[in-house]
A protein has these predicted regions:
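Residue-level detector of transmembrane insertion/anchoring sites
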Residues: 62, 66, 144, 165-168
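Non-catalytic, topology-defining segments of multipass membrane proteins
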Residues: 1-140, 152, 182-224
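Alpha-helical membrane-embedded segments
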Residues: 144-151
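Interfacial helix-loop-helix junctions of multi-pass membrane proteins
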Residues: 157-170
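Short, membrane-exposed interhelical loops at transmembrane-helix boundaries
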Residues: 170-176
Length: 224
């Protein structure tokens, strides 16, 4: 997936019908509002009704969060950057991720929209329940919190400079993924798997192109 030009204004039109187009957008707070009850409610249900211990709940919750980072990496690398031959597959990949490379300043498409997000969440929870049984009531909330942290980190990378020095590699890794090489730097919430699988940028050698980085940042509202 290669895009020769970054569009700095507006957003991609994914569907002709305005109702469908609206369903492709999401505000971060809406997504957090949808999933916070799940993150809190499922472990409470498991503790009160399934008699899972606090230690077990905590362990599977943390494992779920950590598993998200691997899931994020694999999806980004092998699904969202898959070189498809069919037009339908190309369109699907563009809807899922390609439009973000084309319009990196689009704030409304950094999180998956509510409806497809809920459908996918139900399917993922069902699969995790089949594999993990009642442990999924802790694993899935951890997995979802990992997703919310990923989405929020992605938003922050395009909105602000890194607030702490130790976070700068995350920012630079993602910026370089956009403007230098789309086949590296797949981790957004973590660079661990880029380092494990050899797709990490050498940040000591790569010079930061401030002009290109600025093209990736959300436009700041001008105060009149």
């Amino acid at each position: 997936m290669k895009f020769e030009k970054i569009h700095n204004k507006g957003q991609a039109q994914l569907f002709r019908h305005p109702a469908l187009e609206m369903l492709t957008k999401a505000h971060p707070l809406v997504i957090w509002g949808m999933y916070l009850p799940v993150i809190i409610g499922l472990p409470l249900y498991a503790a009160m009704n399934l008699h899972l211990t606090a230690l077990r709940l905590t362990a599977f919750f943390i494992i779920g969060m950590l598993f998200w980072t691997l899931f994020e990496y694999l999806m980004h690398r092998f699904a969202f950057h898959y070189i498809a031959e069919s037009k339908r597959a190309q369109k699907f990949i563009y809807i899922m991720h390609g439009n973000h490379h084309h319009y990196p300043r689009d704030k409304e498409r950094l999180f998956m929209p509510p409806l497809p997000s809920l459908i996918l969440a139900i399917l993922i929870f069902g699969l995790q329940f089949l594999l993990l049984g009642n442990n999924s009531f802790a694993f899935f909330p951890g997995f979802v919190l990992g997703y919310l942290m990923y989405g929020s980190m992605h938003y922050a990378i395009h909105a602000w400079n890194p607030p702490f020095k130790w976070m700068k590699p995350l920012w630079r890794n993602h910026h370089l993924h956009h403007y230098k090489d789309e086949e590296r730097g797949f981790g957004v919430s973590s660079t661990i798997w880029d380092q494990v699988f050899g797709t990490m940028f050498d940040l000591k050698k790569e010079k930061e192109d401030k002009a290109k980085v600025q093209e990736l940042m959300f436009e700041k509202k001008k105060i009149s």
